[in-house]
Regions:
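Conserved ABC ATPase "signature" region
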Residues: 1-15, 63-66
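Conserved ABC ATPase signature
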Residues: 19-23
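Catalytic Walker B motif of ABC-type/P-loop ATPase nucleotide-binding domains
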Residues: 44-47
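Helical segment within the ABC ATPase nucleotide-binding domain
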Residues: 59-71
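H-loop/switch region of ABC-family ATPase nucleotide-binding domains
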Residues: 80-81
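A short, surface-exposed alpha-helical micro-motif characterized by mixed small hydrophobic
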Residues: 86-88
Length: 139
């Protein structure tokens, strides 16, 4: 009964009876969310839910996460590198580096935070912009 409820809630009834090897990576992620519903876990940890998932299924997974949060009260803690996906689902966003909180805020605040840019993109990007400004100033 709980399995059927999860399949219906996630609109994946068509996957009932399929073996794990017969479904795509994104469909497996949806089945994992259904399994979470079966044990009624209220805090769910997700690791790279978007890895290897096409954009259409990622949107479906995002919709399912939002519904589980709003309609069932689930809380999600995610490790994810797709900031567009995170920005759609999470507020606040917390970025960690070397085991410490580096920044906290909205996705747009995080994406423009100098510390985050330096930690994850390196100083090369900032130096490139500075060198471009210097080249333009001396011309």
């Amino acid at each position: 009964a709980k399995a059927d409820e999860g399949l219906e809630f996630l609109s994946i009834e068509h996957l009932a009876g399929h073996k794990a090897g017969q479904v795509s990576g994104g469909q497996k992620k949806l089945l994992e969310l259904g399994r979470t519903m079966m044990v009624d876990a209220r805090i769910v940890f997700l690791d790279e839910v978007g890895a290897g998932v096409n954009r259409t299924l990622l949107n479906t997974i995002g919709d399912a996460i939002l519904r589980l949060n709003k309609e069932r009260g689930y809380t999600f803690c995610m490790i994810e590198h797709d900031m567009d996906f995170i920005g759609r689902l999470c507020d606040p966003v917390i970025v960690m580096a070397e085991g410490k909180v580096l920044a906290e805020g909205s996705a747009s605040q995080i994406m423009s935070d100098e510390r985050v840019i330096e930690a994850y993109l390196g100083t090369g990007l900032k130096n490139k912009d500075k060198n471009k400004d210097k080249a333009g100033a001396s011309a």
